[in-house]
Amino acid sequence: MTDKELNKREEKLAGEGIAIRHPIFLWFENLWYHHKWTIIIVAFFLFVAIVCFAQCATTPHKDIYITFGGSYTMTGEEHQAVERVFDELSKNTFSENIPAVGVVSYPFYTEEELRTLFTDPETGDFDGAAFNMAKGQNANRLEELSSYMMTGECSIWLVNTSVYEAQHMNEKLAVPLAETFGTTPIGAYDEYAIRLGDTAIYQYYEALQVLPADTLIVFTRSYFMGASSNEKTYEQFKALYRAIVEFEAP
């Protein structure tokens, strides 16, 4: 039976008070019933990819970048709001040649967080297939983040503990807090990192509070020292990092 004939049959039966569903609607209902959570999570990660691409494609060049690699996907508005906070801080930190600050985002979720995402809160059913697919995408994102770390383009990182430990940042990349501040601040996560939620800047700026409080702030060494321009940029990174950690509410 053709679609045209089927539509006429539906109209006729509907006129007689009999509701006949088009097969395409039945197919979608069946797909949703059996694969609801897979569809939701796939759509979620597609949203993550689209947001990341949009942020990269629409963000103008900045002088220095802060990289977020944590358990949250910022919307476009949230991303811009976070950038404005650090850009304002830059203006208050530098008296001349004020660097424009950009934020690069690599959303990365822990395995426990992924398991929660793929578990139906009503039934407790776990979608193992969708979980494994998302886990693979997560691994790819971590690899991309790792490659970006090696470029030396960024020295200020906001990462979750999984990224911090997976990249061995305290062994290979991070500058000891005592080297920057003269001593390790009380309450620091370890000798290299401070929790974002413990800083005054996080408490003061509501825009930053979309990021998880247990996000770690890490300052890393530059791989490409030598050229005067690189050294100048690194010193700007260092000054901004200190301003973030030592921020005092007005």
Where do the language-model regions lie?
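Bilobed periplasmic-binding protein/Venus flytrap-like ligand-binding cleft at the lobe interface
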Residues: T199-P250
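Alpha-helical transmembrane signal-anchor/signal-peptide segments
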Residues: T58-S71
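Hydrophobic membrane-insertion alpha-helices, especially the h-region
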Residues: W32-A57
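Short extracytoplasmic
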Residues: G69-F108
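N-terminal intrinsically disordered, acidic low-complexity segments at the extreme N-terminus
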Residues: M1-A19
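Loop/turn elements at helix/coil->beta-strand transitions in domains of secreted/extracellular proteins
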Residues: I64, E96-P99, T151-S155
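Cytosolic juxtamembrane amphipathic/interface segments immediately preceding
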Residues: R21-N30
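Extracytoplasmic "Venus flytrap"/periplasmic binding protein-like
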Residues: F118-G197
